[in-house]
Amino acid sequence: DCLGWFSGCDPNNNKCCEGYVCHWKYPWCRYDL
């Protein structure tokens, strides 16, 4: 199971769905703009 849009995530263990990024400053799944 991957994490969807705006789910809290761990930048060191990114489990976001494909197409999303997890940044240390913004620790939630979001589009890579």
Swiss-Prot record:
Changing P11A: No change in potency towards Nav1.2, Nav1.3, and Nav1.7. The modification Leucine amide is found at L33. The record marks W28, R30 as: Pharmacophore key residue. Changing N14D: Increase of Nav1.2/Nav1.7 selectivity over Nav1.3. Changing D32A: Slight increase in potency towards Nav1.2 and Nav1.3, no change towards Nav1.7. Changing P27A: Decrease in potency towards Nav1.3, no change towards Nav1.2 and Nav1.7. The keyword NADP does not apply. Disulfide bonds join C2-C17, C9-C22, C16-C29. Expressed by the venom gland. Keywords: Amidation, Disulfide bond, Ion channel impairing toxin, Knottin, Neurotoxin, Secreted, Toxin, Voltage-gated sodium channel impairing toxin. The presence of a 'disulfide through disulfide knot' structurally defines this protein as a knottin. Negative results: shows very weak inhibitory activity against hNav1.5/SCN5A (~60% block at 3 uM), hNav1.4/SCN4A and hNav1.8/SCN10A. Gating modifier toxin that traps voltage-sensing domain II of voltage-gated sodium channels in the resting state without significantly altering the voltage-dependence of activation and inactivation, or delay in recovery from inactivation. Inhibits hNav1.7/SCN9A (IC(50)=134 nM), followed in rank order of potency by Nav1.6/SCN8A (IC(50)=191 nM), Nav1.2/SCN2A (IC(50)=239 nM), Nav1.3/SCN3A (IC(50)=547 nM) and Nav1.1/SCN1A (IC(50)=674 nM). Belongs to the neurotoxin 10 (Hwtx-1) family. 22 (Htx-4) subfamily. This is Mu-theraphotoxin-Ssp1a. It comes from Selenotypus sp. The lineage of its organism: Eukaryota, Metazoa, Ecdysozoa, Arthropoda, Chelicerata.
